[in-house]
Every structure is written in C-alpha cells, then in structure tokens.
C-alpha cells in the first residue's frame, strides 16, 4: 500500500473525459495495481479511480531545455487504453507499507449460520427467489448471498447479526461494483439482520436497499411468528 498526499490535478481520458483541478488530495496505490484519488469528504468514495489490471508510470516533467521542473506526471492505464493522468505538483507526505495478505472479514458463528440457513430457505426473502451462490466473490470481498427474485433480477444480500450503518455501507460498495457487470445488472440489495438499527434502516431505504429482519429461531425450524419483512 502506498499513500501519497499531494497537490495534484487529474484528467481521465477514456469513454468520456473528466478533469479535477489542482488541489490537495490523497493518492492511494494498492498492491493489486489499483489507483484511486480521494478528497477529504465523500466517505469511502474516491473522486476517480482505475481498477486492476492497470499500469502506473511516473515521469518527471521537463522544460524546453530538458531541465526537470519539479512536477511529475503519473499515467495510469488499463487494458482498454483508458487513462488517469495525474499531474503531481508537490508531495506533502508519502508512506509505503506492505500490508500482506488480508484474511478478510470473519463472521461470528451466528452470522455464518444465518447465512447458511437463509441460503437453504431463500424464499424467506420472497416467493420465487432462487439461490445463485453463497460467498459470491468480488474484487472487494465476497457477497454473503447472491440470488434472483421471481422476475429473474439479481439480488445481493448482506447478512448481519446486528445491522448498523457499516453494514449498509458495505452492501452499497458491493452493489456499486456488481452493477458494473453487464451479466448481472441491475442488481438490487437486501440488508438482512436479526436486529436493524433505525439509522441503518433509514440509510438503506434512502439508497433503495430493502431491509429484512430475520428470526434466527424461525430459520432453524423452531416455531416463531416474529419474522418480519420490510
């Protein structure tokens, strides 16, 4: 992981063109080759980014006499020929660190069992639902459950024991990525938990994500009437 806080401008050249004027930003270069540009807002969302596989070349800019002027041009290019051209005027801070292989999110026993049970009884989410697979792999981690509704539309399900805002944000990231896949989109989201905090429910509904309150005992086959769908 390489983190660079720098004064820079950014130009995207590809299917369309976009420009970010000169300003202080965070440049994040990950070991997988991805590069993203962040401002001090927008939560986790970058201003612009390039996903792997891509290449990064850094070249000093020179004047007409061939002398370096203290400015560097970063060119990030993917296989399609799309480019991020980052003009780095000044680096304020730079840090590189090998984070190693991340073990990923580890669910507690109840969450893992909820996922297993919901996959077995996927029609809990609605009549006509069918399971695609558990732990559907993506570039940013596995989606708990990927399924299809009665109309054949793709649905991504995030399962939590206690549903809070972090879980909604996590599902939102999955949806943003999955909806770029021509074979899957449009992808809807379901946030499922034994208990969903009011703030999380409000955020989910604002983003068009359906909330499902799960009764663990019902899914285990024990009589209960507390399963509620929203």
From Swiss-Prot:
Keyword Hydrolase: yes
EC annotation from Swiss-Prot or TrEMBL: 3.1.-.-
A molecular function GO annotation: DNA binding
Domain of life: Bacteria
One GO term describing the cellular component: cytoplasm
Annotated keywords: Cytoplasm, DNA-binding, Endonuclease, Hydrolase, Nuclease
Family annotation (CDD domains): NucS-like
Location in or out of the cell: Cytoplasm
Classification via Pfam families: NucS_C, NucS_N
Main location: cytoplasm
Membership in a protein family: Belongs to the NucS endonuclease family.
Function as written in the Swiss-Prot or TrEMBL entry: Cleaves both 3' and 5' ssDNA extremities of branched DNA structures.
Name the UniProt record assigns to this protein: Endonuclease NucS
Origin species: Corynebacterium efficiens (strain DSM 44549 / YS-314 / AJ 12310 / JCM 11189 / NBRC 100395)
């Amino acid at each position: 992981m390489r983190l660079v806080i720098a004064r820079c401008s950014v130009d995207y050249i590809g299917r369309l063109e976009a420009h970010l004027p000169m300003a202080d930003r965070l440049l994040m270069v990950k070991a997988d080759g991805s590069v993203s540009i962040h401002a001090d807002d927008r939560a986790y969302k970058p201003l612009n980014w390039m996903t792997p596989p891509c290449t990064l070349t850094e070249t000093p800019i020179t004047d007409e006499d061939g002398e370096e002027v203290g400015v560097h041009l970063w060119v990030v290019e993917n296989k399609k020929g799309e480019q991020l051209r980052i003009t780095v005027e000044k680096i304020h801070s730079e840090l590189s660190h090998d984070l190693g292989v991340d073990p990923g999110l580890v669910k507690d026993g109840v969450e893992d069992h909820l996922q297993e049970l919901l996959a077995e009884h996927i029609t809990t989410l609605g009549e006509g639902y069918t399971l695609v697979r558990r732990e559907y792999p993506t570039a940013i981690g596995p989606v708990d459950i990927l399924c299809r509704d009665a109309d054949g539309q793709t649905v991504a399900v995030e399962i939590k024991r206690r549903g809070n805002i972090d879980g909604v944000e996590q599902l939102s990231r999955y949806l943003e990525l999955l909806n770029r896949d021509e074979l899957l989109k449009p992808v809807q989201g379901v946030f499922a938990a034994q208990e969903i905090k009011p703030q999380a429910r409000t955020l989910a509904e604002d983003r068009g994500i359906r909330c499902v309150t799960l009764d663990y005992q019902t899914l285990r086959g024990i009589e209960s009437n507390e399963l509620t769908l929203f």
